[in-house]
Amino acid sequence: MAQESKPVEVSRRIKAPAAIIFKILANPPRHMDFDGSDMLRGAVLDHPISKVGDTFTMKMHRLGDDYLMLNYVVEFEPDRCIFWEPASGDPSRAEGNDPAKVGIPAGYRWGYILTPEGDDTTVVTEVFDFGRVSEEVHQSLLSGGGTWINGHNSMRESMAASLERLEKISTE
């Protein structure tokens, strides 16, 4: 049964053109530079996202565990929005994974909406939408004491930190 939950959204006005910000967001190797959750450890391949259907894999770390996360790009509008759906399971290891579900989108999305305000300012909204996940995935996201999702407080804080870091690297 899918969860009936509203997306978590955090916005920040950044004094940089949307094109500069989008170029960073569409480049997975740069994601670690602005990650406010401190979960990202780098991208597996060094290539930018260019369209819906692209995939990219990130090296992740959470609660003392290193793993890989395959992501499917599901929305891509240059200088306006980019969203991806992480897949279930770590394709690099068999233990703890249901082989039938590894690599299948888990039903939640991460993304960014860019709203230009003139030529040199952009409102960037980071979005985490877990409204389409199964109860099983929802509980999995809450595992580990809900360190980054339970009640959304720490998630909002890490999203705000991400946008603050994104601002810094967008204006260098």
Labelled PLM ranges:
Residues A43-G103, A161, K168-E172:
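Glycine-rich portal/gate segments that line the openings of hydrophobic small-molecule binding cavities
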Residues S92-A160:
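Beta-strand/loop substructures that line and gate deep hydrophobic ligand-binding cavities in soluble
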Residues S5-R13, A18, T55, L68, ...:
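Intrinsic-disorder/low-complexity, polar/charged segments enriched in Ser/Thr/Lys/Arg/Asp/Glu/Gln
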